[in-house]
Curated annotation (Swiss-Prot):
Family: Belongs to the D-alanine--D-alanine ligase family.
Record-given protein name: D-alanine--D-alanine ligase
Pathway listed: Cell wall biogenesis; peptidoglycan biosynthesis
Sites where the protein binds Mg(2+) 1: 303, 316
Record carries keyword DNA-binding: no
Known role: Cell wall formation.
PROSITE patterns: ATP_GRASP, DALA_DALA_LIGASE_1, DALA_DALA_LIGASE_2
One GO location term (cellular component): cytosol
Location (main, coarse): cytoplasm
GO molecular function: ATP binding; D-alanine-D-alanine ligase activity; metal ion binding
Domain of life: Bacteria
Top-tier EC class: ligase
Amino acid sequence: MTKKRVALIFGGNSSEHDVSKRSAQNFYNAIEATDKYEIIVFAIAQNGFFLDTESSKKILALEDEQPIVDAFMKTVDTSDPLARIHALKSAGDFDIFFPVVHGNLGEDGTLQGLFKLLDKPYVGAPLRGHAVSFDKALTKELLTVNGIRNTKYIVVDPESANNWSWDKIVAELGNIVFVKAANQGSSVGISRVTNAEEYTEALSDSFQYDYKVLIEEAVNGARELEVGVIGNDQPLVSEIGAHTVPNQGSGDGWYDYNNKFVDNSAVHFEIPAQLSPEVTKEVKQMALDAYKVLNLRGEARMDFLLDENNVPYLGEPNTLPGFTNMSLFKRLWDYSDINNAKLVDMLIDYGFEDFAQNKKLSYSFVSLGEEKIGKFN
């Protein structure tokens, strides 16, 4: 039987470029372990260009990236408006895209728009699901409207931020808040703030990443929980995982970028999280509800905060969960008796299924007729 060709895309121009490479390595190995697919790899360099497959294989093997990119760029006609994606065409046809691009391009809907334009199946959520979920402010608005508990927040831009002094923030949200760039992932552009000086610095930092910034209340005694969700119309939810860092209960520690991807030796992981049956049921249901409200398909990770009274708050969704050796998403499915090879096989099947469903939808239009719309000279 002819193997289906899977285009594994990784890298990108976000601050999570290197994380994407590590996730892609594990996805590559998992896809290969199924013995069902031919894998074609495409790295997206930090300059936004898709690299040819041979160069991409070297980068996936963690060879020094910049010389590889420099050599590739010498072969590119940069005057061609489609030069950035020319490598896709030169690799021939493939059956499905498997994006592993964290942050910009991969999680904001950009790549999904390209896949839709090319009329090809892909793994994961549709463009609108990615775009909405990547915007933390818009996500919280949708969660709130649909009755899914989340933390209190304020959204500011560079102009309206002047109306929110630190004293006003404290009165509204409390004396510990998190300041976040609205459209970033993996704790990039996020600061924990406890005073006016930190608040000013945090706003300045977050506005480097986005023109929209979220200011969010801290949750007292918070435990951080993660839940994996996979599927389309009838999604599956994983066991719940928990992680704590030193001083997290007092509010002095939190699960930041360093703890996620650089050094997690101080992080305590717990799978399954030790929760009451009632809280476990509520968290899983909230995860499923959010998955549907945000129009997610294929895969997602839902992050929660559990307060000192064991009340869960949905933090944010991640529509393209990390799959590094440190990633809890990967471990959650292992614990749920779905190993890596089985997981990627299911994700690929979900991609084909969603594509087939969308093909049944009508995109036809009714002509208004020349006599109604007039002629153009």
